[in-house]
Amino acid sequence: MQTYPTGYTESHRMAEKIFREILPRHSMAVREEQIALCHEVLDTLYNKEISLCEAGVGTGKTLAYLVGCILWQMNRPERMKLPIVISTSSVALQDAILTEYLPDLSAILLDEGIITAPITAVVRKGKERFVCDARLAERASLVQLSRKRQKNSLHIAENILDMDHIPELSRYDRCRICVPQSCPRDCFLRLDCRYQQYLRDFRKPDIQICNHNYLLANASHRLEERPLLLRQYQALVVDEAHKLPDAARQMYTETLSAKDMDDLCSLLQQAHFKGLSKRLRTVFLTLSISCTPSFAMPKRKISIPFSLTPFRQAAIADCINLLQYIGSQPDMPHYLQYRLAETESLLRLFLLDVPTRILYLEFSADGQLTFCAASNRVPQLLRSALWNTREPTILTSGTLTAAGDFDHTKQLLGLAAYAPLRHFRAESPFNYRKKCLLYIPAPVSYTHLTLPTT
């Protein structure tokens, strides 16, 4: 018989009370699928397991897992309490959790005396998404008064730290005012820096919210024993879990674009290696020419498999030899040595027949070339990065099954051989046949269109 830690029965009892009594008093309907999902979340957390939870549209899955996580966290011993991580695919869901779901739920639970302090949460994202006050001041001083829209966006940035919420901010300005990878120790705004204050204010949140890429980046840091991006956590919820394999494929794909090549040459020139920069541009240009397709390029992004022709082999070898030579210069700065070695390492993959890599060339709509080396071991990498930690995990989405079967999703997520693995399905309460509308675009001809009679 399974024995549960103290608080298991109380958590399930309180979940029933919240969904059947408390939330209805605040104009929320009782949904049986939502209650069942909350109980599944609690069982998964207390058993320290992984659960695949498919919850159809209208189930109320977000509130279900939030209540489950809060009740579980509430009933844990104080010394064992750590944050819970919620990973999503979309910024919209992150914002909804942070500004709607959690504040409303926190207020209700405080009012009912279930919790004694507000639930705290923070969205974790890369520092390049936040405003650097020093760089903002410098950038604002350079923009002409006639550029009213640009001036207005920069003025808004003085009061909004997160650049994702600044309207009409150009990509160019984002790059010029974002927090740098390394803040100078002698920064004149360090004591008044909004970003540093943001970090201080959210050192110990109850819930950390991030996107799938940030979650995977944190896992990579842990495996490589580098400083973690997320504070150590005790449970993980992956919402929009059907998007996690796509994020992993992106994360585990190395790329070298035409812009990367141009940037590297520009950095060399700025570091007073003009002759070497010119030589590198020449071999990069030869490499790009060797990869030009023999067919007419369509006006859209395309990807084609990479094949190693003698011309390409010679061009790549020339690039690698020159990159090695430049990197060996005694007065070469460390940051440039790193960039040169990184570029060399990726190009070397295109010379070797690496069985764990899928090599292809990507061309943008305007014909710009990118070398791509994708891993064909994404499921294994996901398992190593996320599931082998044995932290309780809930993966939820409205689309995790195919004809009621989780097998395909388990394969993509690296969970095919994982045990024990829980499964849960809640059908959408909506009657799609009666309530869905079919919209037909205006250009479609109705002459030969036959609509169903039922």
Description of each model-found segment:
Residues 48-65:
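Walker A/P-loop
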Residues 184-203, 221-227, 328-436:
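A contiguous, basic/glycine-rich beta-loop/short-helix subdomain that forms a polymer-engagement track
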Residues 29-41, 45:
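N-terminal pre-P-loop "Q-motif" helix
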